[in-house]
Amino acid sequence: MSSHGRTICKCRVKKTAGLHDELGLKGRTLIVFTGDNGSASSGTLNGEPYPKGKGRQADWGVHVPFIVRAPFLNKGGVVSRDLIDFTDLYPTFLDLAGVTPPKTLKLDGKSFVPSLRGDEDPFKKRSWIYSQIGDFRMIRDWYHIIDNKGAFHNLLKDPRQEQKVSPQDKIAPGRRQRLQMILDRFPKNAPAPFPEFKAKHPGLN
């Protein structure tokens, strides 16, 4: 996003939050700012094109901004590295509303209210995120990402995913094996989560 785009975005979000304050809703309103997909493949960052953006199974294709304003839960200004998925939104809204979903309702996500409060049990935090488009699948944790083509990347050292980590790397083997084991749980012929959706370009990477 250009500096001009960031300025416009910041102003509009600030205006929305300010309106809630004027209406006296600040103490009981949750504001979530996010996006529905990664950066546009035709976009630029600091004058350089985005690598593997929207529509592609790469971190920059699925990783989106996620900013939450919840003054009744925390003072704000906190940056969290917790892995959050869109499936977590519904359970979170139910949690804040004090609604307990029926046991017969299967939910893929979980409430991230503990993360907002800053008291999430480290042993209960999500440790990986799975994504799929067509027959192309990938899984990532906080720092690494692997796909069903065998490509493994260190997102801290290589956010553009241009350098594949060698299987002989002394630091990464444990991470690679763990993520590969989780990815292997999904059958190779597993259908997309939404069978009614058929990607025009399945398997872009």
Q: At which residue positions do the language-model features occur?
A:
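Charge-dense polyanion-binding interfaces
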Residues: 172-194
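Soluble non-cytosolic domains of exported or imported proteins
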Residues: 3-10, 80-87, 106, 170-173
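Histidine-centered active-site microenvironments of extracellular/periplasmic hydrolases
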Residues: 18-73
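A long, amphipathic alpha-helix that forms part
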Residues: 1-29
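Substrate-binding clefts and catalytic carboxylate motifs of secreted carbohydrate-active enzymes
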Residues: 181, 202-204
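Short small-residue beta-strand/loop micro-motif enriched in glycine and branched aliphatics
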Residues: 74-78, 160-164
